[in-house]
Amino acid sequence: MKHVGIAIILFASLCCAQEAGGFQPSSTNVWGAEYPQVDSAGRVQIRVKAPDATKVRLNFWSGPKVDMEKQQDGYWTVTTPPLVPGFHYYTLIIDGMEVSDLNTHAFFGGTKEASGVEVPEPGSTYYSIQDVPHGQVREVWYNSKVTGSWRHALVYLPPNYDTQTKDRYPVLYLQHGAGEDETGWIRQGNANFILDNLIAAKSCKPMIVVMAYGYAKRAGQNLSDLTGKPFGSPEMLKAMQEMAASFEDDVTQALIPYIDSTFRTLSDRDHRAMAGLSMGGMQTFQTTLNHLDLFSYIGGFSGAGGMLVLGDRKLDPRTDYNGVFADPPAFAKKVHLLWLGVGTAEPERMRAGLQRLHNSLLEANIEHVFYQSPGTDHEWQTWRRDLKDFAPRLF
């Protein structure tokens, strides 16, 4: 008991010291992990145990890459300069080997599992858990004849879905970006909390949100190996186009029928939307504009128009996407919302491409929304803001 009492006193002293310094454990930490910690200025403290290592380097993907300092107790520590608010991926380089920090949950990004830390945005609560009614996120598997395989998706069901059993709901299909997967919008993007908070504030209608695995190839289809191919090369574009076409068919022929037969959906086109970030935005444009009989709300978050954005040419409304933009009044009758978004700090190629697409749509007299997230890069903080602006405009 004496040892327990001493431990409690030490723990209380440690907590007081942490509060005085302003550092608090990150919301991304595993249970019981004291580090990483974040302070109100956005600085991050990392502390990892590697007593036999000779060099440990902190590797933030969109932030500092710095050597850590070894302490006498075998722990390595570092405090970063202030980071911009939002979610940050990072890894550790221990004696040349890249590993995750076991103190945080794992997040899939950049085609691998990585660690992550959340730097709060002062005054913003729209993407954090609040004392409001919460929906549920369910995990589903569906069999796709397009790919000849079982495929995985996460489905957000709004609050009261299980109690108000006579109600039916519109559906938003929400896609991740390249290098990430169907878990990204929940794990990194906090889409469920964003929807919970918007619905509680009566800022958007209750809806079902489907987040599907975004990579697809047909049964027997051999895609070109993208590894090492120059970005924008004919080989890479061919493989991307093949994969996008396969994903389009999977969504329209397998996923939508599965969702409509499994959940209480409003299954007409006026109650179906699709949006996606980066690669998911490009997939959204291809899928929806080729199937306006199925979709009436379209959103591209830092990605829309495919190579119209990544290339250097303007939209040709007469020919692009089978000429759907050639008749603005007819397009407006079918599409209730066309929405584009980009962060003002995104790479020049992305910003310029989306600005060019926006200007082309203006010249073609196509009604649309062009949202710019101030000060954010090609990152989850941009896409959280995108969803916050996009969702209230639906249905």
Can you say where each PLM-predicted feature lies in the sequence?
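Positively charged n-region of N-terminal signal peptides that target proteins for export
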Residues: 1-5
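Hydrophobic h-region of N-terminal signal peptides that target proteins for export
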Residues: 9-17
